[in-house]
Design a protein with these regions (language model features):
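Glycine-rich, proline-tolerant flexible connector loops at the mouths of alpha/beta enzymes
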Residues: 15, 135-137, 260-272
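Active-site mouth loops of central-metabolism enzymes
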Residues: 12-22, 104-115, 174-177, 229-241
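Hydrophobic faces of well-ordered beta-strands that scaffold small-molecule active sites
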Residues: 9-12, 39-43, 110-113, 128-133, ...
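Flexible, glycine-rich active-site loops centered on histidine and acidic residues
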Residues: 17-85, 90, 129-132, 136-139, ...
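An alpha-helical appendage that flanks or caps ligand/catalytic pockets
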Residues: 61-98, 139-255
Length: 287
């Protein structure tokens, strides 16, 4: 945070039902000051794929939505108010203030992870930034249009709508190499292995009595053809030319910000090469 000057810092996501929101307020306020206002705080209930995480913290996924709403309310109060007394269903706290206050006023962007259209509409109605994941490019564009239209219908000004769209982030897995074949050979086996590991942990630890979601299996190698397909949920994988085409398609669909990760066990050397290609071959065309 201190050594960098331009890069944004963020959480994608903090599963707030599994955290103490006052501690989160203290830690994020400090980080926002150290970075001089480059922090985005992404929050969410977490995934029903990983219900075992809730069990590990002594709670259940069924309480997650209510815990998230209450934790976010307390987080904002801790960031912005003095002499806080909060009595909720899950948190009962009193404290004089959080110091330092966040660098950004009134507080860092608080973006909610949204999977369903219903949760997206809920956030749009109150002008909250959102994080979107796991859709095709065309479906992502439809979600962004829904978000924009809902904010406008709720009475927000065009300036407010544009500000929220500037803080809307879309998550994708990414790996770039010199050629499509090289990128696929680097990324896909590691990606599938990571998926199999997660499925194994879930099968062993997820409690059967909880509401468990089944994660869709990743696309197979034959789904990745020479040109990107905006109608399927493909990762951003390929040569820098192919990935640049994907970025252009996402830009045209209304995407302004991307969160790019690589959760497979790709080597450090190849991951660094991927990031270098991103910064040198792709990013200059989209600034």
């Amino acid at each position: 945070a201190v050594k960098t000057k331009k890069i944004m810092l963020g959480f994608g996501i903090l599963e707030l039902p599994l955290h103490n929101p006052v501690r989160v307020a203290i830690q994020t306020a400090l980080l926002d000051n150290l970075s001089q206002g480059r922090l985005v705080v992404g929050t969410g209930r977490g995934s029903n794929y990983n219900a075992y995480e809730y069990v590990g913290f002594g709670t259940t996924t069924g309480l997650g939505a209510a815990q998230l709403d209450e934790a976010e309310e307390l987080l904002v109060k801790a960031w912005t108010e003095d002499n806080v007394t909060f009595k909720g269903q899950f948190f009962d706290v009193s404290f004089p203030s959080v110091r330092p206050r966040p660098y950004q006023k009134p507080h860092p962007p608080l973006a909610r992870a949204c999977t369903s259209d219903a949760s997206l509409v809920e956030m749009a109605k109150i002008g909250r930034p959102v994080l979107i994941r796991g859709n095709s490019i065309n479906a992502t564009g439809e979600k962004i249009k829904l978000y924009r239209d809902t904010m406008s219908a709720a009475g927000f000004s065009e300036e407010d709508v544009e500000k929220s769209l500037d803080q809307l982030w879309v998550w994708r897995e990414m790996h770039i190499a010199e050629t499509n074949d090289e990128a696929m050979n680097d990324f896909l086996p590691a990606h599938y292995k990571a998926y199999e590991h997660l499925e194994g942990v879930r099968a062993k630890w997820n409690p059967p009595e909880m509401d468990i979601s089944i994660q869709r299996a990743p696309l197979g190698p034959s789904d990745y053809v020479e040109a990107p397909n905006p109608d399927i949920s493909e990762s951003m994988v390929g040569s820098y030319k192919r990935v640049a085409e994907q970025v252009a398609l996402m830009r045209d669909a209304g995407v302004r910000n991307l969160m790019l990760t690589n959760r497979g066990l790709v080597s450090t050397e190849k991951t660094k090469k991927s990031l270098t290609l991103l910064s040198e071959k792709i990013m200059p065309s989209f600034h």
